[in-house]
């Protein structure tokens, strides 16, 4: 059966909206895990391709988790999210690491490092951290998603509700938020100020941050909305590239911890 969302996205002439990407992700990710992976101790590199999209890969051979991916997608859609992962993605964790789930009220810091580079033509997407949370420690389907974007030329889900809300890691962030109805959870996205929908995917960069900074902000400014509380459990932290178009390559490497 033809995917009507994919058909609609394929006909677009502007960058794919995050709302459509969210719908696609909600329909496609669930419990089916496509794409190769490589375990690096407590973390793993995973070519999370959606709908069996062709994303080729080569994993780093040293002890630092990293990978290069290359692909050729002419039209806009959400083809995958190759990423470095620590924790339980929808209850799946081939590294069997036990750092997560971790209750945020009992967590003092979540130090993360993330570096990336890319090259090619018509490249589009977003280099981003992706985090899933639950109200319990069941290692199961997410009940909240929090994203922190770095270099991008895309659009977050929902609408912008905050400008210059915090500064860390060399960026000042805006906040976007909205409901991913297809996936069944709410999404908060912190994105570098003024970068939503910019014309070009950056060819290199990085984002080294303490993720607890973002959760502290949500506790102070969004806990009354009912979507987030520091009593929630963090299931997973991922750092990678949401691939939405291009003929080229990307490299990602990351290290994720929590105390």
Give the positions of each predicted feature:
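N-linked glycosylation sites
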Residues: 51-52, 56, 96, 152, ...
């Amino acid at each position: 059966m033809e995917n009507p969302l994919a058909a609609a996205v394929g006909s677009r002439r502007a960058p794919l909206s995050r709302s459509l990407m969210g719908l696609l992700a909600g329909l496609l990710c669930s419990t089916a895990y496509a794409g190769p992976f490589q375990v690096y101790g407590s973390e793993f590199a995973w070519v999370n391709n959606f709908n069996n999209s062709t994303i080729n890969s080569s994993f780093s051979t040293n002890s630092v988790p990293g990978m290069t991916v290359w692909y050729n997608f002419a039209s806009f859609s959400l083809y995958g999210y190759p990423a470095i992962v620590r924790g339980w993605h929808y209850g799946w964790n081939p590294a069997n690491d036990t750092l997560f789930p971790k209750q945020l009220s009992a967590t003092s810091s979540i130090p993360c490092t993330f570096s990336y580079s890319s090259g090619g033509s018509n490249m589009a997407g977003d280099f981003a951290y992706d985090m899933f949370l639950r109200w319990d420690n069941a290692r199961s389907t997410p009940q909240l998603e929090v994203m922190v974007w770095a270099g991008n030329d895309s659009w977050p889900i929902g609408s912008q509700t905050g400008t210059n809300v915090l500064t860390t890691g060399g960026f000042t962030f805006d906040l976007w938020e909205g409901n991913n109805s297809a996936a069944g959870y709410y999404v908060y996205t912190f994105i570098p100020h003024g970068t939503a929908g910019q014309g070009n995917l950056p060819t290199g960069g990085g984002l080294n941050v303490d993720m607890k900074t973002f959760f502290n902000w949500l506790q102070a400014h969004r806990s009354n909305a009912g979507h987030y509380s520091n009593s929630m459990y963090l299931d997973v932290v991922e750092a990678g590239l949401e691939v939405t178009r291009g003929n080229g390559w990307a490299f990602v490497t990351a290290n994720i911890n929590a105390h």
